């Protein structure tokens, strides 16, 4: 390179050369390519469907909904999760490639909602099954809140370090596909209903004369019929 070209190089270098690290480049490439797997089971998912319209422009963040967990890196759970659905949710999460993220949308997903008070089949929070990155409360959350949750997740991704990501992949494993749910005895024995329900007297408490008299009358009625 001769000396005549140096002034031109000095003028164009600040605008054409970018100094960065491999970690920042990896985070930047994933910010606008989050492909979510939509796991909607209740009314919260109806609010999420509003994002697909032109008013909120769901595609401007690079979010492309996928139907296969092997092509997704974000799972968005919305609605109640029951014990019967829990193994399926865990299996979907395990089939997603790394790095992967979870957004819990709605009160029913975060705490079980109104179904967790006396329901024996409702999971009290999806974070008992899979690790959650962003909690989105509401019943149901508005579409603006969903966009805010996605923005916060993008900020979290932009600050990640490669070493911390590998460490979290090994630590944030609540359950695996080999986990089996054991059926335990119910704590609801129904003893509180014994005072209200009518308890028929046993045959030992009925006098012998009345018992045989009732039995003979039933037998004669059966013979007549």
UniProtKB/Swiss-Prot annotation:
Which keywords does this Swiss-Prot/TrEMBL entry list? 4Fe-4S, Chloroplast, Iron, Iron-sulfur, Membrane, Metal-binding, NAD, NADP, Plastid, Plastoquinone, Quinone, Thylakoid, Translocase, Transport
Gene3D superfamilies named in the record: 3.40.50.12280
Q: One Gene Ontology cellular component annotation?
A: respiratory chain complex I
Q: Which Pfam families match?
A: Oxidored_q6
Subcellular location, record wording: Plastid, Chloroplast thylakoid membrane
Residues engaged in binding [4Fe-4S] cluster: 43-44, 108, 139
Statement: the UniProt record of this protein carries the keyword Oxidoreductase:
no
Topology of this chain in the membrane: Peripheral membrane protein
Which EC number(s) does the record attach to this protein? 7.1.1.-
Q: Which GO terms describe its biological process?
A: aerobic respiration; electron transport coupled proton transport; photosynthesis, light reaction
The cofactors named for this UniProt entry are:
[4Fe-4S] cluster
Which catalytic reaction applies to this protein? a plastoquinone + NADH + (n+1) H(+)(in) = a plastoquinol + NAD(+) + n H(+)(out); a plastoquinone + NADPH + (n+1) H(+)(in) = a plastoquinol + NADP(+) + n H(+)(out)
Q: Which InterPro entries does the annotation name? A: NADH_UbQ_OxRdtase-like_20kDa, NADH_UQ_OxRdtase_20Kd_su
Q: What is its biological role?
A: NDH shuttles electrons from NAD(P)H:plastoquinone, via FMN and iron-sulfur (Fe-S) centers, to quinones in the photosynthetic chain and possibly in a chloroplast respiratory chain. The immediate electron acceptor for the enzyme in this species is believed to be plastoquinone. Couples the redox reaction to proton translocation, and thus conserves the redox energy in a proton gradient.
What family is this? Belongs to the complex I 20 kDa subunit family.
- Subunit and partners: NDH is composed of at least 16 different subunits, 5 of which are encoded in the nucleus.
PANTHER family per the UniProt record, alphabetical: NADH DEHYDROGENASE (PTHR11995), NADH DEHYDROGENASE [UBIQUINONE] IRON-SULFUR PROTEIN 7, MITOCHONDRIAL (PTHR11995:SF14)
Q: This protein is called what?
A: NAD(P)H-quinone oxidoreductase subunit K, chloroplastic
- Origin species, per record, is Solanum lycopersicum (Tomato)
